[in-house]
Curated annotation (Swiss-Prot):
InterPro entries: PyrdxlP-dep_Trfase (IPR015424), PyrdxlP-dep_Trfase_major (IPR015421), PyrdxlP-dep_Trfase_small (IPR015422), Ser_HO-MeTrfase (IPR001085), Ser_HO-MeTrfase-like (IPR049943), Ser_HO-MeTrfase_PLP_BS (IPR019798), SHMT-like_dom (IPR039429). Keywords: Amino-acid biosynthesis, Cytoplasm, One-carbon metabolism, Pyridoxal phosphate, Transferase. NCBIfam families: PRK00011.1. The modification N6-(pyridoxal phosphate)lysine is found at residue 230. This is Serine hydroxymethyltransferase 2. It comes from Mycobacterium tuberculosis (strain ATCC 25618 / H37Rv). Catalyzes the reversible interconversion of serine and glycine with tetrahydrofolate (THF) serving as the one-carbon carrier. This reaction serves as the major source of one-carbon groups required for the biosynthesis of purines, thymidylate, methionine, and other important biomolecules. Also exhibits THF-independent aldolase activity toward beta-hydroxyamino acids, producing glycine and aldehydes, via a retro-aldol mechanism. Thus, is able to catalyze the cleavage of L-allo-threonine. (6S)-5,6,7,8-tetrahydrofolate binds at residues 121, 125-127. It comes from the Bacteria. Pathway: One-carbon metabolism; tetrahydrofolate interconversion; Amino-acid biosynthesis; glycine biosynthesis; glycine from L-serine: step 1/1. It catalyses: (6R)-5,10-methylene-5,6,7,8-tetrahydrofolate + glycine + H2O = (6S)-5,6,7,8-tetrahydrofolate + L-serine. One of its GO terms (cellular component) is cytoplasm. Optimum pH is about 7.8. Is completely inactive at pH below 4.0 and above 10.0. GO terms for biological process: glycine biosynthetic process from serine; glycine metabolic process; L-serine metabolic process; tetrahydrofolate interconversion; tetrahydrofolate metabolic process.
């Protein structure tokens, strides 16, 4: 029997049912994990296209396979669009993820054993910025800068001192859990002082940069890496940007053949579509609502009824799409708070806070993000309602209070249907 044209529902109802269940879960609750977003239907259609069938090792116009005339057009569109979106001279759109984009950049510009300097994972950095068990900590001599114990901000004087002490070949500016903007110009000045390459990992805030509501690192960094989902709202994947032709040549070689073989042209098509969407006025409006929503949430969680329960907002607020909730003085730990919000259909993730006394699987914090709700169309009033629901859930004194909150969450979510074209009957 030829199954080539069988539908998923007909051939594999088990997987189809699980996908449908996930769709209902995403639609009926509030997705507030800061690294998650909703990919537009057009992006998912591009990713689910016949381009998944095509091998295309190499780059547009320089492939090792025949029949690449259409995938060449797809990849060139993605390159041109992302360069225009971020004002970069060169772009590589082939990395399968942000982690592989970072790995390829290091492979291109460093030798094994070279020193790198990045934000400590425990203070908001990322695995690929030098964690010991990650490739970045195994292949390179990883050193770290931290946030200040007084205000939990990156102390640029301390970064400069660490750079002078360790003399890194690469300085990494970027984060996975830090609620403020970074001073890219100062990072570049420090990098120049010690003759280091500055790599900015803007995976979390790329969408804000594209919309013009966050400073761009592109004019300052030697290299900028990013994911294409998160605030950018595209498919899961990575990109690398730069303005130096010599660096661009090294990066292209490091991606292919250095790190990867055949590019995922169906994902690159989805990236191209996402880049086009990110250039639209509606996208800029969405990113502003994303920022405003995070600030509304931070403001609500600093009110007396929350603060008196030992719950605090790290740094007192946010400049980006996420809020870090500090539970070190609260009755709840991070795991308990995550579970409490899950009980009312609000999905967040527990997250370590700087100087966290609890183990990483428990933590003393929450990371709460607004990109997915902004993508669904949530207004300022909606974000105020969400902030009230989160505050009520975190300060609830018994489980009986959670049922009515869950009903309110479901009513709010129902006002914004998700992917109606995908619902199965």
């Amino acid at each position: 029997m030829n199954t080539l044209n069988d539908s998923l529902t007909a051939f594999d109802p088990d997987i189809a049912a699980l996908i449908d269940g996930e769709l209902r879960r995403q639609e009926s609750g509030l997705e507030m994990i800061a690294s998650e977003n909703y990919a537009p239907l057009a992006v998912m259609q591009a990713q689910g296209s016949v381009l998944t069938n095509k091998y295309a090792e190499g780059y547009p116009g320089r492939r090792y396979y025949g029949g690449c005339e259409f995938v060449d057009g797809v990849e060139q569109l993605a390159i041109d669009r992302v360069k225009a979106l971020f004002g970069a001279e060169y772009a590589n759109v082939q990395p399968h993820s942000g982690a592989t984009a970072n790995a390829a950049t290091m492979h291109a510009l460093l030798n094994p054993g070279d020193t790198i300097l990045g934000l400590s994972l425990a203070h908001g950095g990322h695995l690929t910025h030098g964690m010991r068990i990650n490739f970045s900590g195994k292949l390179y001599h990883a050193t770290a800068y931290e946030v200040s114990k007084e205000d939990y901000l990156v102390d640029m004087d301390a970064v400069a001192e660490a750079a002078r002490t360790h003399r890194p070949k690469m300085i990494i500016a970027g984060w996975s859990a830090y609620p403020r903007q970074l001073d890219f110009a100062r990072f570049r000045a420090i990098a120049d002082e010690v003759d280091a390459v500055l790599m900015v990992d803007m995976a979390h805030f790329a969408g804000l940069v594209a919309a013009g509501v966050h400073p761009s690192p592109v004019p300052h960094a030697h290299v900028v890496t990013s994911t294409t989902h998160k605030t950018l709202g595209g498919p899961r994947g990575g990109i690398i940007l730069c303005n130096d032709p010599a660096i661009a040549k090294k990066i292209n070689s490091a991606v292919f053949p250095g790190q990867q073989g055949g590019p995922l042209e169906h994902v690159i098509a989805a990236k191209a579509t996402a880049f086009k969407m990110a250039a639209q006025p509606e996208f800029a409006q969405r990113q502003q609502r994303c920022l405003d929503g995070a600030r509304i949430l931070a403001g609500r969680l600093t009110q007396p009824d929350v603060a008196e329960r030992g719950i605090a907002v790290l740094t007192g607020g946010t400049d980006v799409h996420l809020v870090l909730v500090d539970l070190r003085d609260a009755e709840l730990d991070g795991q308990q708070a995550e579970d409490r919000l899950a009980a009312v259909d609000i999905t967040v993730n527990r997250n370590a806070v700087p100087f966290d006394p609890r183990p990483p699987m428990i933590t003393s914090g929450l990371r709460i993000g607004t990109p997915a709700l902004a993508a669904r169309g949530f207004s300022h009033n909606d974000f105020r309602a969400v902030a009230d629901l989160i505050a009520a859930a975190l300060t609830a004194t018994n489980d009986d209070q959670l049922g009515p909150l869950r009903a309110q969450v479901q009513r709010l979510a129902a006002r914004y249907p998700l992917y109606p074209e995908l619902h199965r009957t």
